[in-house]
């Protein structure tokens, strides 16, 4: 079972880690509230994960060493850097949300008060004694108010993804809550995401309109695409290319292609650099599977040793730190442990 716990198909991991640029979310994603975070990287998933298609952002780069007091879900990781403007104030950037989303990865491990304390410590580690520290704390309180407001929605804001009217209402509700709680921070936090969701919803409305002929649909979709900013069009083209690459990787795996054959095929369609990244990912994946299987066996021994929950959790956390030394690996292992229904 241990090996299966750590395994993820290479095509899916290609999407997660961005083999060929931006990762694509195919189709319509689940509309969810602010639930616990689970992810393969240090940043995890954003709490406002609702999206009608779109592009998944890459995990932010770690900026400062992790403190010794991190909860198990963040063990072995470091917080993303909080950006500052030229005047030393907190920059109005999506990176600020990424910082808070990193901290929210520990939500399942901590009480609300302990989570607040964690955020206060992580902010102080970067901004202690600065005006930006006060600003970051204020934005955190606003963000918490946003998440709390989402949680009050019916079914925490979850809707039937086939009901376009409900999707439209959910978008409007979230935008209203974001503006009410975050104020001028709502745009850097959610502006690009909301625009993308509305664009994708408009596409769905066109494609599902039975009163239109195929030619009319194509005409309206083309007109809609022309409304897309140039940078968004370029991003969409990259998404389309990556989606095709992911499909190709899945087909090659399904056909039992050897690593050399897969690399040769991908070199023809993606180029040598992307093919080399896939090959490296295959090697990294094999290494991960082996180390996770060994770790899971040792973890099972600890779990069966009759220790108190506190001692058991401490020993497993220490084991993760010894086995998984690269950034984000211990977080990934802890996430897989929770998903497997083990100690965490």
From Swiss-Prot:
Protein name, entry field: Lipase chaperone
Function as written in the Swiss-Prot or TrEMBL entry: May be involved in the folding of the extracellular lipase during its passage through the periplasm.
GO terms of molecular function: unfolded protein binding
Subcellular location: Cell inner membrane
Family annotation (HAMAP family): Lipase_chap (MF_00790)
Family: Belongs to the lipase chaperone family.
GO BP terms, alphabetized: lipid catabolic process; protein folding
TM regions (residue ranges): 14-34
Origin species: Burkholderia cenocepacia (strain HI2424)
Membrane topology, as annotated: Single-pass membrane protein
Pfam families: Lipase_chap
NCBIfam families: PRK01294.1-1 (NF002333)
Upper classification of the organism: Bacteria, Pseudomonadati, Pseudomonadota, Betaproteobacteria, Burkholderiales
């Amino acid at each position: 079972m241990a090996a299966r716990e750590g395994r993820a198909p290479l095509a899916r991991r290609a999407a997660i880690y961005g083999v060929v640029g931006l990762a694509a979310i195919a189709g319509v994603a689940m509309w969810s509230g602010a639930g616990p975070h689970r992810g393969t990287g240090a940043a995890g998933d954003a709490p406002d994960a609702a999206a009608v298609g779109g592009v998944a952002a890459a995990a932010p780069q770690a900026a400062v060493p992790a403190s010794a007091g991190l909860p198990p879900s963040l063990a072995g990781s470091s917080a993303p850097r909080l950006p500052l403007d030229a005047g030393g104030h907190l920059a109005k950037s999506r990176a600020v949300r990424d910082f808070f989303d990193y901290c929210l990865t520990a939500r399942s491990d901590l009480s609300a008060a302990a989570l607040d304390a964690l955020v206060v410590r992580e902010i102080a580690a970067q901004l202690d004694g600065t005006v930006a520290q006060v600003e970051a704390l204020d934005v955190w309180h606003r963000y918490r108010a946003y998440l709390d407001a989402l949680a009050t929605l019916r079914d925490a804001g979850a809707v039937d993804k086939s009901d376009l009217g409900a999707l439209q209402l959910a978008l409007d509700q979230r935008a209203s809550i974001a503006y009410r709680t975050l104020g001028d921070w709502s745009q850097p936090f959610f502006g690009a995401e909301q625009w993308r969701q509305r664009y994708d919803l408009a596409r769905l409305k066109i494609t599902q309109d039975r009163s239109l002929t195929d030619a009319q649909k194509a005409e309206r979709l083309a007109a809609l695409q022309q409304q897309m900013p140039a940078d968004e069009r370029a991003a969409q083209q990259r998404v389309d290319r990556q989606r095709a690459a992911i499909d190709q990787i899945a087909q090659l795996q399904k056909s039992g292609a050897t690593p050399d054959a897969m690399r040769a095929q991908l070199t023809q369609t993606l180029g040598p650099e992307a093919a080399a990244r896939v090959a490296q990912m295959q090697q990294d994946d094999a290494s991960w599977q082996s180390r996770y299987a060994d770790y899971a066996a040792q973890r099972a021994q600890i779990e069966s040793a009759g220790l108190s929950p506190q001692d058991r959790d401490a020993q497993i956390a220490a084991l993760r730190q010894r086995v998984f030394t690269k950034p984000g690996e211990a977080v990934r292992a802890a996430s897989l442990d929770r998903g497997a229904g083990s100690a965490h």
